[in-house]
Amino acid sequence: MEDSKPLSVSEVTRIIKNLISGSKDLKNIWVRGEISNYSKASSGHIYFSLKDAGSLIRCTFFNYSNKNYSGKPLSDGKEIQVYGTITLYEAGGSYNLNVTRVEELGQGDILLQIEKLKQKLAVEGIFDPEKKRRIPSFPKTLGIATSPTGAAIEDIIKISRSRFPGINILIAPCIVQGEDAPDSIVAAIEELNHPNWKVDVIIAGRGGGSFEDLMAFNDEKVVRAYANSRIPIISAVGHQTDVLLSDFAADHFTPTPTAAAEYAIPKEEDVLQFLSQLEGRIKSSLVTKISSNRDRLRLLSGKFIFKEPMQLLNQRSQRVDEIGIRLQKALSNKLNLARVRLERYQNLTSRIQNILFHKKQKAEFWTSKVEDLSPAATMKRGYSILRNENGKIIRSPEETKPEEELQVLLSGGTMQVIRKGK
């Protein structure tokens, strides 16, 4: 035997508890098996064991967790899967599975499909808070989409009438459970959206039920109908679960049809009190406005314009006449100035024309002089120009040779000549 100090039972139990509580593998786990030793205490806690072919584990389903369970009743021999954490019961020295959620086998696959649909619709913005429509404070007509025979319709009508007897109620009956339920719910919502009915708010839902009973309100068509409704929708499905997609798509959701009616319909006495307060505020505002206008009228009545209106009008008329005379005089001065400028421009034009005429005569005279001095004019008077065969102008006989062929340029043309003699 070793010399180490022996541990007490409590110490060993505490070590085991710490090991269990510190293990991530034993927290938030799913366990499947068959129910045995099922019992429910007066406190509401449920105790049972889960077993398979080789082992058994004790489970505790506390009241605060099992009150949200809406599935079929639990009983011995039923196959389920549970979600929870392993804990150690120190007094008994036994470990236990503290259950927070129970699902029937096969339900987990459905939940996975619902979660995928939820993510898909969330990406599309179906659940966006900014798209939620405001629930009217004082609806005149309430539309109800639910089963015409269930307790939900009775609760909604009873509460609505008790709160506001004058409320108009329009019922669009529909199937709320089974394969035909989704299409029936969609048709009811679309009918209540028809403009002829003038519905202000819709309550859509049903009383409580099992997980399978509520599946219609997780259907994609129903969720889209909620989101696409022109009229605000309050979701009212009893025993609300955390996977009911229609609740997320609705403009507001409540845990029961009764709560939906209480939220949608104001109490008549509250409405009357509001109207009374509103009437008081309107009267107070009118009194203040009238008093303010009376003071303003009194102030204006003391002004000159209201005391001697004709005198003020005569002054304004005289002022207009003075302005008219000034305008007429200014216009006359403008016209005279323009007339003087026009005459000045006309005289200037005449002077320019005379100058141009004299300039033209001088130009013609000098042109004639220049033409008289040109070679062509000189040759017309009998002169000629003599060139050698290279085109050089001959100015004296010494510049030519005997028998040299020369060109004579006359006024009428040219001719060839030959020099004779020395």
Swiss-Prot record:
Domain of life: Bacteria
Subcellular location per the Swiss-Prot or TrEMBL entry: Cytoplasm
The keyword Transit peptide appears for this protein: no
GO CC terms in record: cytoplasm; exodeoxyribonuclease VII complex
Enzyme Commission number, as recorded: 3.1.11.6
Keywords, comma-separated and alphabetical: Cytoplasm, Exonuclease, Hydrolase, Nuclease
Single GO BP term: DNA catabolic process
A GO term, aspect molecular function: nucleic acid binding
Substrates-to-products reaction catalysed: Exonucleolytic cleavage in either 5'- to 3'- or 3'- to 5'-direction to yield nucleoside 5'-phosphates
Pfam (any one): tRNA_anti_2
InterPro entries according to UniProt: Exonuc_VII_L (IPR003753), Exonuc_VII_lsu_C (IPR020579), OB-fold_nuc-bd_dom (IPR025824)
NCBIfam families (alphabetical): xseA
Description of how the protein assembles with itself and partners: Heterooligomer composed of large and small subunits.
Protein function: Bidirectionally degrades single-stranded DNA into large acid-insoluble oligonucleotides, which are then degraded further into small acid-soluble oligonucleotides.
HAMAP family hit by this protein: Exonuc_7_L
PANTHER family (UniProt xref): EXODEOXYRIBONUCLEASE 7 LARGE SUBUNIT (PTHR30008:SF0)
Family listed: Belongs to the XseA family.
Name used for this protein in its record: Exodeoxyribonuclease 7 large subunit
Organism lineage string: Bacteria, Pseudomonadati, Spirochaetota, Spirochaetia, Leptospirales
